[in-house]
Amino acid sequence: MFHSEYEKKLRSPSKSPGSKTNYYNNYSNNNNNTPIPLPLSIFHSTYEDNGSNNNNNNNNNNINLNSNNNNNNSNNSGSNINNNITTPIKSTSTTTTTTTTPITTPTTTTTTTTTTPSYDSYGDRFIPLSIGLESQNNYSFDESSYEYLYCYPSENSYTIDKQRDESHLAYNIVLKNELLGSSLSSNFFDSPSSIYKSSIFNNNNNNNNNNNNNNNNNNNNNNNNHVNNNNNNNNNNNIDTPTNNNNNNNNNNNNNNVNINDTTATTTTTTTTNTNIPTTTTNATNNNNNNSNNTTTTTTTTTNTTNTTNTNTNTNTNNNLININQSPSKKQSLMSATMNNNNSNNNNNNNFGILKYNQKQKSTMSNHLDCSPYSLSLLSDDSQKLLSSPRKPQRKISKTPIKILDAPMIKDDFYLNLIDWSSHNILAVGLDTSVYLWNATTSQVSKLCEMESGQPVSSVGWIQRGGIHLAIGGTDGVVSIWDVNKKKKIRELQGHNTRVNALAWNNHILSSGGKDKVILHHDVRDCSNNYTNRLVGHRHEICGLKWSPDGQQLASGGNDNLLNVWDHSMTQQPQQQHQPPPPPPSSNTSSISQQQQQQNTSKPLYQFKFHYAAVKAIAWSPHQRGLLASGGGTHDKCIRFWNTTTGQSIQSIDTGSQVCNLAWSKNINELVSTHGYSQNQITVWNYPTMTPVTTLTGHTMRVLYLAVSPDGQTVCTGAGDNSLRFWNLFPSNKESSFSSNLDSFYNKKGLDIR
């Protein structure tokens, strides 16, 4: 079945180790230049003699052969064993012992290998293996098998197996290079970890003498007899060889960094070597135990060497199966710089920058602008930074009142309105049955009047233009008009049966609302003392009444939780001519006949039923036409905004306490609210965001009364704690003198109240 010569070669004894050494010498003498690797797809003949083995250049292996042919002082074979290669050789018993002794110069490494292989003879049959040899758990790898297969001439008894293994190994190399490129290591295939610790470029403190060949062989045939070999076997545990229960892999101290420094004093040589190599002995014995844990000892060697002579430096590229001999490209240089960014401060070559944790710098506005990468803004980064700069801080509002006045006998009644501030900067206050005036300019206090009926004052209201006439409502239903300069009562207006809770001026029209659920319009130019119109729309007493700034709409709030909006054009009705004057009031008859009430009755334009408590707080915005704000009582606690041009609700906010009063600032788009149960606070709101600007406290009881100064900066609040407090809440207005000029104009023109 077998050829006779072939069978003879198969049965011939194996060559002695000495022939292997001669092989190396012959190899070096016959190949002074760098050998050209054979094509990977060509199989070597199984009928070659011993001399033909010299042509086998061991393509695509990672063996460093460094020979000095002139003096033969040292033959240095750098055997950097890569754990990422597995050979399909079955071994029954393998014992390998490697001992490294801490010697400064020179360093001697003794390796004793005893191998008893057992092979299966397949004859002339060719049995293919799978592509990934390292993925086969039935095959184990050891250094002796690698040495026989790739370093020595082929043995006739093992030719078939070796040729098959070499071909598959070459195929694996080509396949991986096609997948990863020549610049990547095969460690990416063999390591099961998701984090790869590999060095693509040489990171050691040695010189790279790679002359564009696959075998890293640097033969310096010079007359200098000094050879300095720095063989760094840095495997760094980046190879994870699969093991199974039947075969254990022998780990022959591949993690030790050993620098062999041989110095021959034949020429003048200055070599400074500081080598600190701890003694490390690793015995890895395979006794077919079902133990897959390999003993691995890692020794870190720090070497500082200064050579001033010709140095032959042999450096393997850190376990790369295929050495990278091309000049690094720009991309590779950047990657190398990234991986070596920590080597300047640390002599340990095992520290790679790519595996270091870098603290992320805190992002600041000066570094970059945190904006969307899909932003379509045409502004530059500098412009965006400028626009995104912080706004001016909110103005500071003092939480301490600028002035506190005693107000004894002031009523603690939610339905009353007992303070008002005139355009002439005079504050009117109703205290029990009397009315007092406080001049804010001179701080003088004067008493205006005492109610003739002896009934308490229920409401006060200054005329808007002129500022010298004050309307006073009493609990007897009578409204009197006083000239404050002369301290004289000009007129008395009748029409209400009970107390008058609210008063509102609209030029020469005085509107009053009372406990009798009706609203009466009086034209003060008419001396007949008759009301011009009567508005009926509430089911309970009226406690809030305000005209819009343009004088076209009137808002009223009552204890029936209703907010009504009245149109002034609809309420104007021509008075009947020759109407007899009303009869004098008596205890048995009403001041207004039933016929007159039916003739002058109007209905509201809008009626809002969203509040759940009495509506006393009402305020029209001076900045937006038709914007109305209203506040509910204890069971509502909400501020609601309305569009009176469309009759729609805009928004609402829960304040958390009873809303007693509302007032807009004419200088800024803000409003102030006063509250009762349960917080008794004063809050300034920003509109339309309705974010609180500030909250003020000081009153010990419900803040039932509110008035704003004519300049719009100061507000006065009153409470049942018998005190009046003045607060600076709003900024000044550059056009604040405009209202004063109007007042001066109307004062000169005069308003004839008869």
Swiss-Prot record:
Database matches in CDD domains: WD40
Gene Ontology process terms (BP): anaphase-promoting complex-dependent catabolic process; cell division; positive regulation of anaphase-promoting complex-dependent catabolic process; protein ubiquitination
MF-aspect GO terms: anaphase-promoting complex binding; ubiquitin ligase activator activity
Domain of life: Eukaryota
Region (Disordered): 1-30, 47-116, 200-351, 570-598
Keywords assigned: Cell cycle, Cell division, Mitosis, Nucleus, Repeat, Ubl conjugation pathway, WD repeat
Composition bias type Low complexity, residue spans: 50-116, 202-325, 340-351, 587-598
InterPro entries: Cdc20/Fizzy (IPR033010), WD40/YVTN_repeat-like_dom_sf (IPR015943), WD40_CDC20-Fz (IPR056150), WD40_repeat_CS (IPR019775), WD40_repeat_dom_sf (IPR036322), WD40_rpt (IPR001680)
A Pfam family reported for this protein in Swiss-Prot or TrEMBL: WD40_CDC20-Fz
Location in or out of the cell: Nucleus
Nucleus among keywords: yes
Chief site of localization: nucleus
Bias-annotated ranges (Basic and acidic residues): 1-10
Family: Belongs to the WD repeat CDC20/Fizzy family.
Subunit structure, interactors included: The APC/C is composed of at least 13 subunits that stay tightly associated throughout the cell cycle: anapc1, anapc2, anapc3, anapc4, anapc5, anapc6, anapc7, anapc8, anapc10, anapc11, cdc20, cdc26 and cdh1.
Function of the molecule: Component of the anaphase promoting complex/cyclosome (APC/C), a cell cycle-regulated E3 ubiquitin-protein ligase complex that controls progression through mitosis and the G1 phase of the cell cycle.
Protein name: Anaphase-promoting complex subunit cdh1
UniProt lineage: Eukaryota, Amoebozoa, Evosea, Eumycetozoa, Dictyostelia
Gene: cdh1
